[in-house]
Amino acid sequence: MWTFPVEYDVIVIGAGHAGCEAAYCAAKMGASVLLLTSNLDTIAKLSCNPAVGGIGKGHIVREIDALGGVMAEVTDLSGIQFRILNQTKGPAVRAPRAQVDKQLYHIHMKQLLEQVPGLHIMQGTAEALLDDGEKVLGVSTKEGWAYSGETVVLSSGTFMRGLIHIGTQNFSGGRLGDAASLGLSKDLKRLGFPLGRLKTGTPARLLSSSIDFSIMEEQPGDQNVCFVHREEAFVPKLPQVSCHITYTTDKTKDLIANNLHRSALYGGRIEGVGPRYCPSIEDKIVKFADKDRHHIFIEPEGLNTREVYVNGLSTSMPFDVQYEIIRSVAGLENAVITRPAYAIEYDYIQGNVILPSLESKILEGLFLCGQINGTTGYEEAAAQGLIAGVNAVNKVLHRPAFIPSRQESYIGVMLDDLTTQVLDEPYRMFTSRAEHRLLLRQDNAGMRLSHYGHALGLLSSERYAMFQKQKNCIEHEKERLAKTFRKYGDSIVPLTKILCRPEVSYQQLLTEFPEDVKDWGPIIGASLEMEIKYSGYISRQQTLIRSMEKAENTLIPEGIDYHSISALSLEAREKLSKFTPRTIGSAARISGISVADIQVLMVSLKKDAY
């Protein structure tokens, strides 16, 4: 087998969202990088929904930007609708989401990658890893040649032994229209990696000209929403479009109930476990039988196509049943299908075989990121790609691994969860997974993480200076407003106390006290308002973090009867009894154990003087 005459610092296998981020970041750090993909025309392809962000996910993309990654920039360049979700709820759960033009997203990502010095993008299909039994040495390809590398980042997506299901029909594929990867699974088994099966799915695509939008609810975008941190208000590069909302009907329920045996999922033909929080329409009908109808979102796939994505109608039903189900939905009575819905099973690596750096415990120098680790979602994959790419370079340079903590980032929450829990279903990020989410808002990602990005060489000095300016400005202004007293009602109070009132916004404070309050613009003003309004809660969370850090290594005595601690949640009592953790820290990392449970446990240990 011929070996390519260049030895790379980092070889990245797969150019999905994890692979692109890994290759980009590794090359930006000065490494020589090979990005190996089976098809150059599907780089960063949005295989499922044409959107980036959302609850928890939008926070991750903002963190990627704060660290110097690329996903946020490509999203802003490709966005055709931007929104803030949960606007009526607290600041911790507000999150940006963008509809993107699928084709432009691919084009912009490919263009950005092509401009990075030291990054070689090559079409080829990885067939096996090269190793000496202990350390990875490179990769061999299906085409018959090999590449040598100090480290390898494997981001295989849904391609490892991918099996597509449409009703009773199934066939090999990494996604519809693309071949599966068969060799890598076999090779990972050879090396001793435990493989399992997971499942995901995608709905049909329809022709927009065949849809009756007049009976649907229009869902326009919001102003001044973006993913890249900026000093000025954001103006989208592309024309902006609306999404639309419709609903299933009684006919939809009847069609699914009568054909459930023909579903690949319910017919017993799918072995893998699907994502709990992204169920198929047949799953919804079965598990939520009491609901009369379900939301369906019609989302444009791009500006230069009439195809739309039918969010909420994912299914593995046969095509003839899909046809009837789609036409049972209000406004879709005459819908023309352009691509069928399908489910896909794929291999992932089971068990706790990765370090928090995302390096494999089994083969030195091999880093794993994305769906191969059991996650689902573009954003989760991209964040892992950034961490894997950075740490592959750190490995080559003999530097310590970069591992952000769960107290300072959603990326840290995910890394901790992936390396301390055994996943039995696809992992998706939600704000509820973070114990200190008020500290991890999407608006303060730059202030939390930009110093890491700058130190790693990913974030330019200019952008780092912008983040520092914003941080210093907010800290200084908080202090100044706290020392500025004015009459409000019958009392003389500091301006911070006035702003803490729920009905008072920073803009109102600026209008009422123009000589005392500075206009820092909408971006800094919004962050400043949140920092002041929620200062009490933020302070308590910071105190709790310090307390938890102090208690991390506190021993839990053997034989403790968790069922006797009535203040613990039922789930906590069951799981603590099952796993019998030795320390408070290990107890806190068990899936389903909340911060409140840990606090109850700590109080109980002190009270009973174990």
UniProtKB/Swiss-Prot annotation:
Intracellular or extracellular location(s): Cytoplasm
Annotated residues that bind NAD(+) are located at 274-288
Q: What is its main location?
A: cytoplasm
The protein's matches in InterPro entries, at most eight in alphabetical order, are given as: FAD/NAD-bd_sf (IPR036188), GIDA_C_N (IPR049312), MnmG (IPR004416), MnmG-rel (IPR002218), MnmG-rel_CS (IPR020595), MnmG_C (IPR026904), MnmG_C_subdom (IPR047001), MnmG_C_subdom_sf (IPR044920)
Could you give a GO molecular-function term held by this entry?
Answer: flavin adenine dinucleotide binding
Under the heading SUPFAM superfamilies, the entry gives: FAD/NAD(P)-binding domain
GO CC, sorted alphabetically, is: cytosol
Matches recorded under Gene3D superfamilies: FAD/NAD(P)-binding domain, GidA associated domain, C-terminal subdomain, tRNA uridine 5-carboxymethylaminomethyl modification enzyme MnmG/GidA
Give binding positions for FAD.
G14, A15, G16, H17, A18, G19
Q: Name one Pfam family in it.
A: SAM_GIDA_C
Per UniProt, the keywords (alphabetical) are: Cytoplasm, FAD, Flavoprotein, NAD, tRNA processing
The record's listing under SMART domains reads: GIDA_assoc_3 (SM01228)
| Domain of life the protein comes from | Bacteria
Entry's Gene Ontology BP terms: tRNA methylation; tRNA wobble uridine modification
- Cofactor (UniProt): FAD
Role description: NAD-binding protein involved in the addition of a carboxymethylaminomethyl (cmnm) group at the wobble position (U34) of certain tRNAs, forming tRNA-cmnm(5)s(2)U34.
Among NCBIfam families, the record links this protein to: mnmG_gidA (TIGR00136)
Q: Which family does it belong to?
A: Belongs to the MnmG family.
Q: How does this protein assemble?
A: Homodimer. Heterotetramer of two MnmE and two MnmG subunits.
Q: Kindly provide the name given to this protein in its UniProt entry.
A: tRNA uridine 5-carboxymethylaminomethyl modification enzyme MnmG
Q: Which gene encodes it?
A: mnmG
